[in-house]
Amino acid sequence: MAGNSQRRGAVRKPGTKKGPTVGSGGVRRRGLEGRGATPPAHMRPNHPAAKKARAAAKAQQQRAGRKADETELVLGRNPVLECLRAKVPATALYVALGTDADERVTESVQIAADRGISILEVPRTDLDRMSNHGLHQGLGLQVPPYAYAHPDDLLATARADAAPALLVALDNISDPRNLGAIVRSVAAFAGHGVVIPQRRSASVTAVAWRTSAGAAARVPVARATNLNRTLKSFADAGLQIVGLDAGGDTTLDELDATGPTVVVVGSEGKGLSRLVREHCDAIVSIPMAGPTESLNASVAAGVVLAEIARQRRS
């Protein structure tokens, strides 16, 4: 048989004799020790799934950036007039052709003209398209994106003032009306600014502007990438961090806020988050005579800011 070196008369070529099968001595096995399970596809840098995930994340970030830079269109006769009365920054007033000019339309056009805001008459179909067929009643006010400050800017502003620093931080407040009302209270009681998280928080929209009664033009609002780190930096700068909660172990009557202070207001539903609580020097509750369990976030902030202002006048 061909290739059978065991047959009689066969001659084996030198160096072709196979020896006994020998393993690696455990080298390959030891080389694999400690590596653990194979990571999922999206965690392997060169895997198509990982590349796809990175591309999706980048696209989402770009969309978020574009959204943050987009202008806002306030719709309806009452909302537009309220924004103009509150001196909300605006770049254009759109009036649909053929709109009945009642008192609200007339006053809106007059205020816009006095402030140098462009007044543009457009076909109603154009305003329908611009508003995604929202209820505009023939009026639309274009509002530019709000220019947010940096948290460090608030500290610099506070240090330039003779009075001790007074800042308000919002822990995931989602209602822009609460944000606007808090900004208004900060302005009324000599606060130096408001800090909001960059994500999962109300932003300074036209609704917030309107609720603030124009105070957003005087009180800087800063966005924090990480609210907990920002609170820690405030604490390192010597500010007292005071959280508000109905179940706080310190009452407002016991609080001493004559020194530099940050008041942290929790979200409307869940209150202060666990990590934010851990950064607070005190959790303060507001004494109430009636059976009401808690106050609205903006009302609670206003009560505390009024008390701090009283302490600092004494």
Curated annotation (Swiss-Prot):
EC id: 2.1.1.-
Keywords from the named record: Methyltransferase, S-adenosyl-L-methionine, Transferase
GO CC, alphabetical: cytosol
Signal peptide, first to last residue: none
Top enzyme category: transferase
Residues covered by region (Disordered): 1-71
Pfam families recorded: SpoU_methylase, SpoU_sub_bind
Molecular functions (GO terms): RNA binding; RNA methyltransferase activity
Gene3D superfamilies cross-referenced by the UniProt entry: 3.30.1330.30, 3.40.1280.10
One BP term from GO: RNA processing
Residues annotated as binding S-adenosyl-L-methionine: 266, 286, 295
Membership in a protein family: Belongs to the class IV-like SAM-binding methyltransferase superfamily. RNA methyltransferase TrmH family.
This protein's name: Uncharacterized tRNA/rRNA methyltransferase MSMEG_6073/MSMEI_5913
Lineage summary: Bacteria, Bacillati, Actinomycetota, Actinomycetes, Mycobacteriales
